[in-house]
């Protein structure tokens, strides 16, 4: 909502999981309805719907939020088997910024290498992140979503917002 309030023209893209999995955070129908309400657009829900993002080049930047460990791993290894991953691949062919808002319980575990690969990739920028609960979940990393807008602004200048590592107090 804050992004829309700041004047952004948002094209929502949903992963297969977000379209189908009910969780403690809510159900897919609720999310789709809220996304339509905020963006005033139908979300992109398929790989074929996401592919034209490349040739049409209509996005200034693309943000993946939340970016799960699974999505980060697939992105780092060039796998494009969801609408979000196809959108990222298609968008990046235009040398425009991709902003990642990480949210994974495995960021300092098996996924650390994937986050490292993405941090070292051209045109990929991270919303600053930190350990949200280092005692109960020592490998968990979560982005500071309140820094999404300044991260996007810096990414549009092809700069990483700093510091990229930020404590949760």
Name the predicted role of every residue range:
Residues 1-82, 86-98, 105-169:
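A cross-family phosphate/adenosyl-ligand binding-site feature
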């Amino acid at each position: 909502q804050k992004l829309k309030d700041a004047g952004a023209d948002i094209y929502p893209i949903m992963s297969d999981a977000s379209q189908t999995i009910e969780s403690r955070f809510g159900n897919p129908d609720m999310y789709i309805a809220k996304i339509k309400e905020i963006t005033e657009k139908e979300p992109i829900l398929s790989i074929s719907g996401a592919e034209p993002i490349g040739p049409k080049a209509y996005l200034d930047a693309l943000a993946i939020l939340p970016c799960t460990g699974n999505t980060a791993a697939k992105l780092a290894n060039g796998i494009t088997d969801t609408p979000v991953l196809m959108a990222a691949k298609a968008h990046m062919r235009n040398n425009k910024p991709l902003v990642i808002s990480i949210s994974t319980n495995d960021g300092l575990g098996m996924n650390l290498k994937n986050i490292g690969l993405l941090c070292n990739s051209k045109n990929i920028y991270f919303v600053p992140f930190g350990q949200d609960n280092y005692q109960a979940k020592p490998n968990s990393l979560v982005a500071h979503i309140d820094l999404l807008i300044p991260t996007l602004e810096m990414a549009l200048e092809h700069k990483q917002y700093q510091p990229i590592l930020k404590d949760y107090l």
